[in-house]
A protein has these predicted regions:
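Hydrophobic transmembrane helix segments
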Residues: 14-58, 62-63
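Membrane-interfacial loop-to-transmembrane alpha-helix junctions, especially the N-terminal start
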Residues: 5-9, 82-91
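Structural signal for membrane-spanning alpha-helices in multi-pass inner-membrane proteins
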Residues: 23, 72-76, 102-105, 127-131
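Short juxtamembrane and helix-loop transition motifs at transmembrane-helix boundaries
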Residues: 45-55, 75-86
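Membrane-helix boundary connector in multi-pass membrane proteins
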Residues: 97-117, 132-137
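Hydrophobic alpha-helical membrane segments
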Residues: 71, 86-103, 119-127
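Transmembrane alpha-helical segments in integral membrane proteins
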Residues: 64-79
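Alpha-helical transmembrane segments and their helix-start/interface "positive-inside/aromatic belt" motifs
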Residues: 1-15
């Protein structure tokens, strides 16, 4: 059974990279950015103010995503079981806060991330909470 905290954090970090990939790609690909903009609000890619807002949105969320990834991989370097467990708890709480809005929106029939991304966002939440409660060195 998977109980090694560092392995669970590695799985979480890989899931983070996979779920953030479309966001990172949107920063460098005008086609992907336009797709996301039009998927969210039709006609927004034609409005210069909306484009600016989306550019800021993509940049802020890309940095947040990068922070999640870096924090997860840095936490893997800790050697103390208690520190690893507390780090897992803190990371799990942040990941839950990141994932929860999409799940609330889907239950309310509002726009949300694609289901694959939503499922990927659950992997870190579950693995990090599990590491906090049951993890071993």
């Amino acid at each position: 059974m998977l109980k090694k905290i560092k392995t669970l954090m590695l799985i979480s970090g890989i899931a983070d990279v996979l779920q953030m990939m479309p966001l990172f790609l949107a920063l460098f690909s005008p086609e992907i950015k336009t797709f996301f903009m039009e998927d969210g609000i039709q006609g927004s890619s034609q409005n210069p103010m909306a484009v600016e807002v989306f550019n800021i949105f993509f940049l802020v969320f890309a940095f947040l995503g990068l922070a999640f990834i870096v924090a997860t991989f840095v936490a893997r370097t800790f050697e103390n079981l208690e520190v690893l467990q507390k780090s897992s708890l803190l990371l799990a709480i942040y990941h839950l806060a990141w994932a929860l809005p999409d799940f609330i929106n889907i239950t309310m029939g509002k726009p949300h991330a694609p289901l694959l991304i939503m499922l990927l966002s659950l992997i870190p939440v579950v693995s990090l909470f599990y590491a906090w409660k049951n993890g071993e060195l």
